């Protein structure tokens, strides 16, 4: 969706609109002040290629005015430059201007000097009514206290100076603003006083000049919204939960019309109910956990499946905006007087790493592309081509769908369909993070309407622990009746909404998940791309290997043979083809527009479309690496340095990856990156100390990664300056980590000297058996503690440009 200053953005009670038409965007959070400015454009392109339409970003007050009156919009704090990069990448933007943000920042983003203006200390974020004269406070934070509002106005004015010229009405990227965060839920006032404060902040922002079509506010946990669009959230776990034990299954894996996540912010005190009328607002999310930020006491590891399954459940439950927090991890900037992370020392409930805000996000702290990125991209591809129609499909609860998140036996299902029931999707989830779900072999899958009528019958499907998917169905008008077909595409006679039996109608329902459309509405043939999940053909059809499958190292069934002939008949009549992928292939697939024609590309690297449509591939540079690229349709010319595999063209309607054209290229990488670790004796301490030397860091590398596998409570690296007379500052960190059991990945390119080298002092702190911390898997504690480095490796992240003659 391309917007301009003439575009009219609004919303109905069901969805967002652009010029009156439904719009289903994908939004992802990135904090410009937690990234290097020279990396912004590169990382924004990755976000766009991951399916993000709108970036959201906190403007964190303490990052801009740590010292009262000393404003800093330079370097990583240069909001104006960031907005120009957002525009350059063709993205849109929501700025979350607070003034309180949270974001695991010191004081929730409030500068220390502002907090100290309260004469009497209060619990972090807690508001006290101005009428409480007994306290005789000079100022009450997060209230309509005139003094507080005067500081907020000054902050808003500074942010506006940076944003001016970048609003949508000026052909800029800013389409929306969020006021405050979790107000009335994590601090602030509730009830009429809270609503009035939210309206006051919005009014102030408008007076200053902020002019956007969309204004939002936190909607969960009793937060007040001031009449603005409520946005919801949901996380697969709760690292803020004070417990250090395994916690109950998340409610975010249950299909439900309820929008409230009762777990968010439980460390600050929980408001039980939402405060707005759900019937008046669309179901939008701004804080679906793209990952999880670990805390000192609780360190769950979010996976790609954790996030994708949760996202699918939200789609099935009627959500019409997928907004992820965080989409891109980062590193806290260095403070001028203090460190800038959330900590118990400042009265907040959790201790966070001083620097790392990795979040196990789809794009990690140093821009590493993850499985989560690929899985979110897969959903986003579907939404870009089918989302506007999905917006108009209502959520319909299904019989047998459980309401208890702890029910690991019942199959979880939902339907979204058009009001007349003529078209829709059946959503199925048999995945709950870190839980074993009951298998459902040969289960009859049916989609039911609100009146109990069968909308679609998918026949018998094997559903196993960990499966989640959605299948399409629709009504087709036929020339004659059809008998029930028990093949993989089921057809049903159906009574329509008037209760009459229409003999010339049937239901088409296929157990494949749509991925995207190629060349819809263009002069070329339209290709419907989908991927398969069903296992019932395994024994009957046997395994089928293709070149793509061989390279992916996966097994595939002949999905084409698992679909009934009526599918081909239908596609032929509509002038379409169906391209079927396996699960693994779909994770490596992307669309690319070249010369006005859309192509589906599958590669063993990550294909990124950049400025002016240029294509590049990101992958780890290894010796004798082969890059392969599959395309449908065949590219007009072979990329430079690639060889094309000659193949026969198949005229059929049903296609799979054997019908794609293969291009291969031998890469002449000569890895230069090396690292050496030298352990130091620490006789007086159980800490592990080491010197790390890295060399061969080259400018052409996108990133130079050092990967440390360690066991301990935490670790940090301090850079040793080049020989220049400087002494090592013990308090100046280059990177840090809370141990989770995952390898610690550090991007060191930013630390390289002119000689391509960097040196660090590494400290690993011991993890003791009695430590009050939740870990998914503990290391060997036979000595009563763990403190060691088990492995060291390096990884060169390379960018390979695809050039065409």
Q: What is each stretch, according to the model?
A:
Residues 69-77, 99-136, 189-194, 198, ...:
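Aromatic- and acidic-residue-enriched segments that line the glycan-binding/catalytic groove
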Residues 117, 126, 137-138, 148-164, ...:
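Carbohydrate-binding surfaces of carbohydrate-active enzymes
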Residues 186-206, 210, 218-258, 403-406, ...:
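Substrate-binding cleft/loops of secretory-pathway carbohydrate-active enzymes
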Residues 25-36, 61-77, 134-154, 180-194, ...:
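The substrate-binding groove and active-site-proximal loops of carbohydrate-active enzymes
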Residues 695-733, 737-738, 763:
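Aromatic-lined ligand-binding clefts that engage carbohydrates, nucleic acids, or primary amines
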Residues 226-296, 352:
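Glycoside hydrolase catalytic-domain groove-lining segments
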Residues 41-108, 206:
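Aromatic-lined substrate-binding rim segments of carbohydrate-active enzymes
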């Amino acid at each position: 969706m391309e917007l301009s200053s003439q575009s009219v953005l609004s919303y109905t009670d069901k969805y967002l609109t652009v010029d009156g038409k439904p719009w289903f965007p994908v939004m992802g959070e990135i904090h410009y002040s937690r990234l290097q400015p020279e990396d912004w454009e590169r990382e924004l392109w990755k976000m766009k290629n991951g399916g993000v339409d709108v970036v959201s970003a906190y403007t964190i007050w303490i990052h801009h005015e740590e010292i009262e009156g000393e404003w800093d919009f330079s370097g990583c704090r240069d909001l104006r430059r960031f907005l120009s990069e957002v525009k350059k990448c063709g993205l849109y933007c929501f700025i979350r201007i607070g003034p309180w943000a949270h974001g695991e920042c010191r004081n929730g983003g409030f500068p220390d000097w502002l907090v100290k203006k309260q004469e009497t200390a209060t619990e972090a974020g807690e508001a006290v009514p101005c009428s409480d004269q007994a306290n005789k406070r000079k100022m009450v934070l997060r209230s309509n206290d005139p003094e507080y509002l005067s500081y907020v106005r000054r902050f808003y004015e500074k942010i506006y100076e940076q944003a001016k010229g970048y609003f949508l009405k000026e052909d800029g990227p800013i389409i929306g603003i969020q006021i405050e965060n979790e107000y009335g839920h994590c601090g602030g006032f509730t009830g009429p006083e809270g609503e009035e404060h939210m309206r006051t902040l919005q009014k102030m922002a408008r007076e200053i000049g902020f002019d956007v079509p969309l204004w939002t506010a936190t909607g969960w946990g009793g937060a007040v919204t001031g009449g603005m669009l409520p946005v919801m959230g949901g996380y697969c776990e709760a690292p803020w939960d004070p417990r250090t034990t395994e916690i109950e299954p998340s409610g975010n894996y249950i299909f439900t019309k309820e929008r409230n996540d009762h777990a968010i912010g439980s460390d600050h005190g929980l408001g039980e109910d939402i405060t707005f009328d759900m019937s008046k607002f669309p179901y939008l999310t701004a804080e679906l956990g793209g990952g999880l930020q670990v805390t000192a006491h609780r360190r769950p590891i979010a996976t790609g499946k954790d996030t994708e399954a949760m996202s699918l459940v939200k789609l099935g439950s009627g959500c019409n905006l997928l907004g992820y927090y965080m989409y891109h991890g980062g590193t806290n900037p260095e403070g001028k007087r203090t460190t800038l992370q959330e900590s118990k020392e400042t009265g907040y409930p959790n201790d966070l790493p001083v620097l790392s805000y990795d979040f196990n996000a789809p794009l990690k702290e140093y821009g590493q592309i993850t499985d989560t990125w690929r899985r979110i991209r897969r959903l986003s591809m579907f939404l870009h081509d089918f989302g506007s129609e999905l917006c108009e499909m209502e959520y319909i609860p299904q019989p047998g769908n459980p309401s208890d998140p702890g029910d690991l036996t019942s199959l979880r299902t939902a339907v979204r369909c058009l009001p007349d029931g003529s078209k829709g999707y059946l959503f199925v989830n048999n995945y709950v993070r870190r839980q074993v779900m009951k298998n459902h072999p040969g289960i009859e899958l049916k989609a039911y309407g609100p009146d109990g009528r069968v909308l679609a019958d998918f026949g018998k499907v094997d559903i196993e622990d960990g499966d989640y998917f959605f299948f399409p169905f629709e009504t087709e008008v036929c020339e004659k009746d059809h008998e029930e077909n028990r093949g993989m595409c089921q057809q049903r006679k159906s009574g329509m909404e008037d209760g009459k039996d229409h003999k010339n109608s049937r239901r088409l329902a296929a157990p494949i998940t749509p991925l995207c459309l190629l060349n819809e509405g263009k002069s070329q043939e339209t290709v419907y791309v989908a991927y398969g999940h069903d296992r019932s053909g395994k024994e009957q059809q046997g395994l089928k290997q293709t070149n793509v499958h061989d390279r992916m190292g996966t097994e595939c069934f002949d999905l084409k043979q698992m679909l009934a002939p009526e599918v081909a008949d239908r596609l032929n009549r509509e002038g379409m083809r169906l391209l079927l992928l396996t699960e693994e292939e779909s994770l490596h697939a992307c669309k690319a527009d070249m010369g006005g024609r859309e192509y589906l590309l599958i590669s063993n690297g990550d294909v990124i479309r950049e400025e002016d449509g240029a294509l590049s591939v990101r992958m780890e540079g290894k010796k004798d690496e082969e890059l392969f690229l599959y395309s449908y349709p065949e590219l007009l010319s072979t990329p430079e340095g690639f060889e094309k595999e000659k193949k026969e063209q198949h005229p059929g309607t049903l296609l799979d990856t054997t019908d794609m054209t293969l291009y291969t290229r031998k890469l002449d990488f000569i890895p230069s990156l090396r690292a050496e670790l030298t352990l130091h004796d620490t006789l007086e301490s159980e800490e592990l100390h080491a010197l790390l030397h890295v060399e061969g860091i080259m400018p052409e590398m996108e990133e130079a990664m050092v990967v440390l596998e360690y066991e301990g409570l935490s670790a940090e690296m301090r850079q040793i300056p080049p020989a220049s007379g400087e002494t090592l500052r013990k308090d100046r960190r280059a990177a840090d980590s809370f141990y989770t059991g995952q390898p610690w990945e550090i991007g060191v390119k930013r630390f390289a000297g002119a000689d391509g080298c960097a040196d660090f002092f590494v400290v690993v702190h011991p993890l003791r058996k009695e430590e009050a911390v939740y870990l998914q898997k503990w290391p060997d504690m036979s000595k009563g503690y763990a403190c060691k480095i088990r492995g060291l490796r390096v990884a060169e992240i390379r960018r390979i440009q695809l050039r065409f003659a």
